[in-house]
Amino acid sequence: MRHALVVAAAIAASAQYAGAQALPNCDFVFENTPVTTLTRLAQPSGLYLTILGRGVVVSCAGQSNRISADSAEFNEELGLLLLIGRVHYTEPQATIDSDRMTYHRAEDRLNARGNVVATMSSGSVMRSPETDYFRAVVGRPVSRTVAIGRPQLSLVEPGAGGGAVEPVVVLADRIVLVGDSVVYASRRVDITRTSVRANSDSAFVDSQREFVRLMLSPVVTGRGVRPFTLRGGVIDLHSRERKLERVLATPSGHVLSGDLELLADSIDLRLVDEQLQQAYAWGPGRARATSPDRDITADSIYVSTPNQRLREMHAVGDAFANSIADTATVTSNERDWISGDTIVARFDSAAAGDTTRAVPRDLTATGSARSFYQFGNPQGVRERPTVNYVRGRVITIAFADGEVSTVTVTDQASGVYLEAESLTAIPPARPGESAPQTPPRSPARPGTPH
């Protein structure tokens, strides 16, 4: 104790001798240990360079912080305290361990280097080769932690009811932590949590608001039973009670989830229990939804995916859907299609035991509806299909086993139904007989409206 008082008194006397102005926020008190060694070297300015070894303990007078290290050097003229070997800093807001540390008294900034581990009062942990810690002092009410050299932050978020949950892990070239809840990450950002992984060039995280913004080539990947991948210019993630509820990508949104691929200027995903349930696509450009054998485009598209299984699509505004013709009975370069002001498509699972692939149940086009579908002809010639083209206010196409079963037209119905001509071979003429004539082609028969 006597040794600590002697060291503190010597340094205070040096500052007074130099006629120094008011001390910065931290006035060092060297408590030290019974075996601490002390060497003081006078500088031309009249201030001293103090070297301490064999165990050092330092604190700020009247403050709840403390630093311990193997050795230290205090330059009064520069206001720098250099600590070397097993450095351990503590205060109510944070604990920092490192191989070396420099305390800049004028800024109340700690620069820690070598195996730095900074632990916040919330339990969040930053690991890096170098970290600057700006203490919360007068004029800076919130602490700031700046880590470089590809740091890793384990951000602890309180769970619902106050219980702890798995931390969010942030990896980047540079991370700034404001307080213990706001994060700015830049360059090669990788954010991982239980059900989702996000990558971007820069990111902002506010754990109190449960909000994340990803910028510059962001990608979000859902890691549940049925994963999804979302891309866009900027992606926002909103959570509630630490569960992801909404993901918004704009511009150039692109999502891929099992049966569904969705492209639009803006894409909004809604999740329940961190499983994709709904998707909205809209923007100045056209929205496009693609399932295994079908494309739908419109001004905007709504997709229902309960339990992340495709069930419905609503295409609004000059909607157009096309699909590959029935390959079992038709060989054609033409695609089947249906259009209208609005198209609603409903889907089922392929089979009771196969819920990973959706097949169409029915499509309904409303408002100036038109449709073009091809069927196998009676002769079984795949290259010459039967064609059905109809128009009406409402057109409903029902499917059986994924293939067109019936086409129903309601109001203002018109159209044509064309069968391929008979391909029956005509026998050659016998001697003395004239060749038989080709039977006349059947007249076009319009489809029967219902």
Each language-model region and where it sits:
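Bacterial N-terminal signal peptides
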Residues: 4-15
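N-terminal amphipathic/hydrophobic interface segments
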Residues: 19-450
